[in-house]
Every structure is written in structure tokens, then in C-alpha cells.
């Protein structure tokens, strides 16, 4: 019986997601054992600055990918939105389980909705994507950076001077906290989700054919197609955490992919948005990127990157 070593970050959410996925594999009743190996990533250690200033997306996966390449672990369970657009040679996303709610969750101290927040209220987020879109809707708000895992951020909302914070609905759902803490779900038209938000990425080595066969049982074809379109868009624009960038795709009734893609200025004064429909994930992602580039997306990305230096 093969023992599969599964790498995970040490946070409660990461371990919850990892154990949930292992349970799906165990339920198949196939002859495998599983062991979780906890790995500390740079993103878990550096909590005093925003992600955009310390290297963006790769912060939560680099150490785990190193463990995959050196065969310390066999696979890893990531939040798809933490995955860089390009993976190291020899690694691949071997499985995308069914996506859960991709929306952002608005959590206010007083119970006021986003529209009801007092003028000048303090909104906590560490995401340029969220801050740009929400400032576009409410330029009167003040954005104050907030870092840490879910429970840390919820505690900071209670104890510090934040009036509201924004978190991913999916993480709260996976922790079983969504009903008790979420004030409202932000509609995708108000705040387009991050690329891959609500989805998991199961990363493994390309040459591990045995494991890839096992993972195929849990793969969700719709999630795989829609997230692929989002990630092609992200790759073409070379967007990471340093830029207000968003992309969310769904499947239409005719089985086509509909991708809404967005790039914004840091302060939300400019939001470029395009919706593309098509059947091929790669073509849809590239078309969305090309349309936004024609609108001036590259200039916004350059300006955002300069602002981070």
C-alpha cells in the first residue's frame, strides 16, 4: 500500500482544506495511506507588510513546491487564488475539485451593510483587488491594511479600529464560520473575485502517473475549464498581488465559458472591465487580456508596480 505524503501550510484553514481533500480520496476506498506534512511558508512568517510589497502570490507556495520537487511530499493542497500563473518545471495542477462560493464576504463590526457603512469608515483588507473595486464604489472609505489568518483578522476587527473587513467566503465556509460572521456577500458585479477564488489546486509532480490517476477521480471538469480561462488571463497580463486584477469565469447554459476580467488603478479611480464568451479556455483568457491591454491595462500594471517599489 502506497503512503502519500500531503504538504500543507500550518494555518487552520490550510489544514481544514487538506484534511477535507484527503477525506475525499479516502472515500474512494483505494489502497492508499495518507500523511500530512506541515510546512511553514514565507507568507506565514512575514505578517507586518502587505503581500504586494514582499513578492506577491508565490509567498504561500514556494517552500511547498520545493518539498514537491525534492520528493519530501507527493502532493499539496493550495487555495487556487494563492497559485502563481506559472508553476515550476516538473510540477502541475493535478486536480481541481468542485469550486465553492467565489464571492468576497463583507463583515462589519456594527452589522451595517457595505452601502450603510458611515462615511469615512475604515475598511480592512490586504488585497489591492478588493480595495480598488470597493473604493471605486465608495471613494469616501479609508482602506487600512490587515494581515494574518482568518481568526487573526476577525479578532482585529473586534479589537482594533476597523469598521469592517473583507474575507473570501470560501475560507469562512470551509471553517464552518460563514453563517455566524458574514454580514453580506458582495455581488460579483460590485467586486469581481480573484482568479481561482473559491477553488482548490492540488499540485503534484508531472511524472507521478499513479497519483494523477487517483486525483482524476476528484477532478471537477467545470471548475477545471473556468479556472483555466482565468489563469490564462492572469498569465498574459503577468498579474500577481502587486496589481488590482480580477477574473471570474462561469459556464453558460450552452456550455460556453463567460469570463469577466478586470484591471484597476491602485486607488480605484480607474477600473477597466471586459466580459468574453467562448468555448476554449485559452482563447477566452487571451481575448480578455488583449481587450484590457487595448484599454490601457499594461500602463495601469506598470504604474502599480512602480508604486510598490
Curated annotation (Swiss-Prot):
On cofactor binding, the record's note says:
Binds 1 dipyrromethane group covalently.
Q: Which classification does the entry list for the species?
A: Bacteria, Bacillati, Bacillota, Bacilli, Bacillales
Q: Gene3D superfamilies from the xrefs?
A: Periplasmic binding protein-like II, Porphobilinogen deaminase, C-terminal domain
Modified positions (S-(dipyrrolylmethanemethyl)cysteine) are 241
Please list the GO terms describing molecular function.
hydroxymethylbilane synthase activity
Which top-level enzyme class is recorded in the Swiss-Prot or TrEMBL entry?
transferase
Provide the E.C. number(s) assigned to this enzyme: 2.5.1.61
Which sequence ranges form a coiled-coil region, renumbered to this chain? none
An example GO BP is: protoporphyrinogen IX biosynthetic process
Subunit-structure text? Monomer.
> Which organism does this sequence originate in?
Bacillus thuringiensis subsp. konkukian (strain 97-27)
Task of the protein? Tetrapolymerization of the monopyrrole PBG into the hydroxymethylbilane pre-uroporphyrinogen in several discrete steps.
Disulfide bridges in this chain: none
> Which of UniProt's keywords are assigned here?
Porphyrin biosynthesis, Transferase
Needed cofactors: dipyrromethane
Kindly give the SUPFAM superfamilies that the UniProt entry links to this protein. Answer: Periplasmic binding protein-like II, Porphobilinogen deaminase (hydroxymethylbilane synthase), C-terminal domain
What family classification does the UniProt entry report for this protein? Belongs to the HMBS family.
- Provide one Gene Ontology cellular component: cytoplasm
Query: What extra comment accompanies this record?
Result: The porphobilinogen subunits are added to the dipyrromethane group.
Q: Which pathway does UniProt place it in?
A: Porphyrin-containing compound metabolism; protoporphyrin-IX biosynthesis; coproporphyrinogen-III from 5-aminolevulinate: step 2/4
Q: What is this protein called?
A: Porphobilinogen deaminase
Amino acid at each position: 500500500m502506497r503512503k502519500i505524503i500531503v504538504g500543507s501550510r500550518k494555518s487552520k484553514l490550510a489544514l481544514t482544506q487538506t484534511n477535507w481533500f484527503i477525506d475525499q480520496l479516502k472515500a474512494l476506498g483505494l489502497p492508499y495511506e495518507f500523511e500530512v506534512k506541515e510546512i511553514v511558508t514565507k507568507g506565514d512568517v512575514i505578517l507586518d507588510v502587505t503581500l504586494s510589497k514582499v513578492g506577491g502570490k508565490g509567498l504561500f507556495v514556494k517552500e511547498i513546491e520545493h518539498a514537491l520537487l525534492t520528493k519530501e511530499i507527493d502532493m499539496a493542497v493550495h487555495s487556487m487564488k494563492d497559485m502563481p500563473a506559472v508553476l515550476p518545471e516538473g510540477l502541475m495542477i493535478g486536480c481541481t475539485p468542485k469550486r465553492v462560493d467565489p464571492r468576497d464576504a463583507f463583515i462589519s463590526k456594527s452589522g451595517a451593510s457595505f452601502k450603510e457603512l458611515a462615511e469615512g469608515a475604515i475598511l480592512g483588507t490586504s488585497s489591492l483587488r478588493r480595495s480598488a473595486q470597493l473604493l471605486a464604489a465608495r471613494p469616501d472609505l479609508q482602506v487600512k491594511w490587515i494581515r494574518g489568518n482568518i481568526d487573526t483578522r476577525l479578532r482585529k476587527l473586534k479589537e482594533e479600529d476597523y469598521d469592517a473587513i473583507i474575507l473570501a467566503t470560501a475560507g469562512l465556509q470551509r471553517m464552518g464560520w460563514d453563517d455566524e460572521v458574514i454580514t453580506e456577500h458582495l455581488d460579483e458585479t460590485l467586486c469581481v473575485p480573484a482568479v481561482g477564488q473559491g477553488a482548490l489546486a492540488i499540485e503534484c509532480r508531472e511524472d507521478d502517473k499513479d497519483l494523477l490517476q487517483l486525483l482524476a477521480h476528484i477532478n471537477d471538469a467545470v471548475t477545471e475549464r473556468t479556472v483555466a480561462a482565468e489563469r490564462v488571463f492572469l498569465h498574459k497580463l503577468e498579474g500577481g498581488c502587486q496589481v488590482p486584477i480580477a477574473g471570474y469565469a462561469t459556464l453558460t447554459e450552452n456550455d460556453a465559458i463567460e469570463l469577466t476580467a478586470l484591471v484597476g488603478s491602485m486607488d480605484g479611480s480607474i477600473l477597466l472591465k471586459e466580459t468574453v464568451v467562448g468555448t476554449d479556455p485559452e482563447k477566452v483568457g487571451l481575448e480578455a487580456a488583449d481587450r484590457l491591454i487595448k484599454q490601457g491595462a499594461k500602463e495601469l500594471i506598470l504604474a502599480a508596480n512602480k508604486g510598490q517599489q
